């Protein structure tokens, strides 16, 4: 009898892992992406791009494109809309542009980004 109870509890635990809503999972990963970018942790941001992107773009190429040209001060996910294998995330990003000799302060903008389900995980889509 104790073995049967353990099997039931194990099955219930595994089932609960799959019950995370795509919107919640994507929101968390998008927040992690922007936290990494704001902290200058380009390697962590790169790890959240899709495996198919990483097959054709190296970390150094990603870093050249998305290094610290504009200082990201903060970001917050505003909205997540999901289809079965694609989510659109609207994120408010606050940046301090690096303009030589000009101080423009912090600028806030909203970005729409795509997250794709690939190999059972959500990844940030990045144009090549």
Named regions from a protein language model:
Residues 10, 19, 119-123:
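Non-catalytic interaction surface on structured domains
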Residues 1-16:
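Sec-dependent bacterial lipoprotein signal peptides
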Residues 42-83, 88-90, 97:
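Short solvent-exposed beta->alpha transition segments
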Residues 83-128:
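Exposed beta-sheet edge and beta->alpha loop/turn motif
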Residues 22-27, 38-39, 55, 86, ...:
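Solvent-exposed, acidic/flexible segments
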Residues 8-11, 39, 69:
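Alpha-helix termination/capping residues and helix-transition junctions
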Residues 14-39, 47:
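Short, low-complexity N-terminal intrinsically disordered segments enriched in polar/charged residues
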């Amino acid at each position: 009898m104790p073995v049967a109870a353990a099997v039931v509890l194990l099955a219930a635990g595994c089932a609960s892992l799959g019950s995370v809503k795509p919107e919640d999972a994507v929101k968390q990963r998008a927040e992690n992406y922007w936290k990494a970018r704001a902290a200058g942790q380009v390697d962590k941001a790169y790890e959240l791009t899709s495996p198919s992107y990483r097959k054709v773009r190296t970390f150094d190429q990603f870093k050249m494109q998305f290094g610290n040209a504009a200082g990201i001060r903060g970001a917050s996910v505003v909205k997540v809309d999901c289809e079965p294998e694609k989510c659109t995330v609207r994120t408010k990003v606050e940046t301090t542009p690096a303009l030589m000799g000009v101080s423009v302060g912090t600028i806030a903008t909203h970005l729409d980004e795509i997250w794709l389900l690939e190999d059972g995980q959500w990844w940030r889509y990045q144009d090549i």
